[in-house]
């Protein structure tokens, strides 16, 4: 005998990242709402069979180098990562920052980043997006033309700081960044 739809409310499962989820609303097999049982309590619409399979994606699971996640915007929407099938430039900036600090291959190529970290807030892409306009040089970054190379720097403003955060970071041209690196190495 099949369970009634109301009997499925409260049913628990674990997703592929090990996060517990609970059905909080069951409309039918094709429309259920689950709440993840972590500090964020994200609610996601999915299908019952996906829930049973454990394939429901939690926006706060650490899917980027085992430290970063996409999160949700303040309006509850997923942050934009691609536009017309191409990674959004803001996502590329965020992902590159995470990769420099936590990617094994990147750390082998550039061991100077071995002590660098990303602040807890910015490990969530949605938070990084929210803070972007607060970063010094944001206008340069957002208005750069194709061919301009604008980079996120933690050293210039942070006096050689090892932490990526809004207080330490600024956007600068690649050429100014290289000049600053040479100046600091003297």
Predicted stretch roles:
Residues 1-43, 58-95, 99, 117-118:
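Short helix-coil boundary/hinge micro-motifs
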Residues 13-16, 55, 74, 106, ...:
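Generic serine detector
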Residues 44-63, 166-168:
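Cysteine-rich micro-motifs
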Residues 46-47, 68, 173:
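Helix N-terminus capping/helix-initiation residues
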Residues 80-103, 107-186:
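Short, cationic Gly/His-enriched loop motifs
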């Amino acid at each position: 005998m099949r369970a009634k739809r109301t009997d499925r409310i409260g049913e628990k499962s674990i997703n592929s990242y090990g996060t517990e989820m609970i059905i909080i609303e069951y409309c039918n097999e094709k429309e259920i709402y689950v709440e993840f049982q972590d500090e964020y309590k994200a609610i996601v619409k999915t299908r019952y069979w996906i829930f049973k399979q454990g394939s429901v994606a939690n926006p706060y699971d650490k899917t980027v180098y085992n430290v970063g996640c996409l999160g949700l915007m303040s309006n509850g929407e997923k942050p934009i990562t691609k536009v017309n099938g191409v990674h959004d430039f803001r996502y590329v900036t965020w992902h590159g920052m995470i990769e420099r600090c936590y990617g094994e291959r990147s750390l082998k190529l550039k061991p100077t980043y071995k002590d660098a970290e990303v602040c807890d807030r910015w490990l969530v892409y949605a938070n990084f997006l929210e803070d972007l306009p607060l970063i010094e040089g944001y206008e340069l970054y957002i208005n750069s033309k194709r061919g301009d190379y604008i980079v996120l720097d933690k050293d210039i403003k942070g006096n050689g700081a090892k932490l990526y955060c809004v207080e330490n970071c600024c956007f600068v041209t690649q050429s100014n960044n290289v000049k600053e690196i040479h100046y600091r190495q003297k």
